[in-house]
């Protein structure tokens, strides 16, 4: 199996993705902060809704720890904007519509909801420290599995 780009203690691959306002958001612009990348398969799908709302409800903790949360999916900026509005998501949702970032972080899932050939982001969490190094990586065995939110906050605390 080939080495993937996103191993622990390696430099996180930089990226530039559009947020819900179609503004460019670069990972490198958060240098010095802890960054939580929350990959999710799709807006308006049950577990994704739960995951993003759980992260939303934890934002005060993340803010207190000088951490930024970035949600990443292959959805369009417009779908992400509606998703953010419906659930009052208070962090950037980024559109990886060409799937480059999901591939760079080895977060591609094939066949969501039985759609053969449909590639989306798998559910996963990457935590990057202020130096831009990957310090935590969790990937769902299948998109129906949620991350351990308290473990994520504990890891962010340990880096702050």
Predicted regions mapped to residue ranges:
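Chalcogenol-based redox active-site neighborhoods
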Residues: 4-160
């Amino acid at each position: 199996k080939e080495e993937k780009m996103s191993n622990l203690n390696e430099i996180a691959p930089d990226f530039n993705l559009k947020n819900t306002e179609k503004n460019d958001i670069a990972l490198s612009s958060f240098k010095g902060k802890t960054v939580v990348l929350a990959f999710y398969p799709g807006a308006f799908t049950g577990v994704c809704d739960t995951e993003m709302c759980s992260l939303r409800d934890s934002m005060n903790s993340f803010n207190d720890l000088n951490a930024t949360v970035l949600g990443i999916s292959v959805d369009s900026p417009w779908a992400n904007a509606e998703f953010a509005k419906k659930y009052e998501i208070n962090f950037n949702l980024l559109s990886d519509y060409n799937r480059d970032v999901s591939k760079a972080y080895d977060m591609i899932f094939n066949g969501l909801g039985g759609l053969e050939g449909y590639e989306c982001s798998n559910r996963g969490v990457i935590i990057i420290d202020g130096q831009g190094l990957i310090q935590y990586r969790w990937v769902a065995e299948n998109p129906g599995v949620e991350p351990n939110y308290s473990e994520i906050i504990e890891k962010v605390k340990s880096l702050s």
